[in-house]
């Protein structure tokens, strides 16, 4: 893929739309991938006029502080709209009997986001630690169902945070996936190679954006430099994508964050910018997302037969919508949105926060135990 094509602006994704045994497993000279744009540096009004600020605000619902460093979304005061939303996206806990009925004679496969799903949303991403109780619940789920975590974080980082060898891990929004070697043959894809994990076991490593690693590293370093004077801004490198967090930035400085990221990314036409929960994500322009990652994992793990398996994806972020959409449109499973704030989604069910996710997972384990005991006789 030729990264140096004759374009001078990045792809800006969805700027105005408010709203998805071990399995784990050198930079080029600065400027190589940069495009020398001759366009005049835009004024600050650009990010206001093109919808960026609207997108930043819509992806950042109001919150209230509970305890130090932890936040929880505030549900709207309009009880009617809240009830109407819950009718459209009923609680996965109170609807569990219906979920169990859908899973009759099928094997469930569980896919989980990390931040905001298994761990609370916190001011400092480095402190997004899942509780021991949540880790135990996920570990129990993996005893009965194939379980994977698909996170926007790097695969190594999310494995470090979760620390369970029973799971499958996909990082960078699914652009870095490690799975066991399929005895019936590995996917015939140039982006899929055989390697060994941390325990020395042979695994398949799928990285559809591996050629972008140098440019992501370059952009990360540049974004750190150009945002270092903005109090509260934090830039993270997730190997195949990078993120600029503005959760701790004074709202009056949001336009400055947006403008600096926007201006810099004009030099990289093969990168796009998307909006998450108080974060700007920079990622390669490739046809890959969490939905594609779910499909890849189902195929790689031999779980793609709709008549035999029921995939469930639990997530809280806009990026999880791609996975929800794949399951909904393929009539092969369903998504569960983690949110206490009404918003449109491709999910079928909802949970308010990570504490309800834990409760749902425990309920799923109880059901799994019961079903397992039936088949043992």
Curated annotation (Swiss-Prot):
The question of whether Hydrolase is a record keyword is answered with: yes
Keyword annotations from UniProtKB, A to Z:
Hydrolase, Stress response
Kindly list the biological process annotations in GO that this record carries. Answer: trehalose biosynthetic process
According to UniProt, this protein's pathway is:
Glycan biosynthesis; trehalose biosynthesis
Q: What class of enzyme is it?
A: hydrolase
Under Enzyme Commission nomenclature, its number is 3.1.3.12
Catalytically driven reaction(s): alpha,alpha-trehalose 6-phosphate + H2O = alpha,alpha-trehalose + phosphate
Q: Which Gene3D superfamilies match?
A: HAD superfamily/HAD-like
GO MF entries: trehalose-phosphatase activity
Question: InterPro entries under this entry?
Answer: HAD-like_sf, HAD-SF_hydro_IIB, HAD_sf, OTSB-like, Trehalose_PPase
Per the record, the domain of life is Eukaryota
Provide the cofactor list for this protein: a divalent metal cation
Q: What induces it?
A: By trehalose.
Q: Where is this region: Disordered?
A: 1-20
Note the PANTHER family from the entry: TREHALOSE 6-PHOSPHATE PHOSPHATASE (PTHR43768), TREHALOSE-PHOSPHATE PHOSPHATASE F-RELATED (PTHR43768:SF17)
Main function: Removes the phosphate from trehalose 6-phosphate to produce free trehalose. Trehalose accumulation in plant may improve abiotic stress tolerance.
What NCBIfam families does UniProt report for this protein, alphabetically? HAD-SF-IIB, T6PP
User: What family, per the record?
Assistant: Belongs to the trehalose phosphatase family.
Name-wise, this protein is Probable trehalose-phosphate phosphatase G
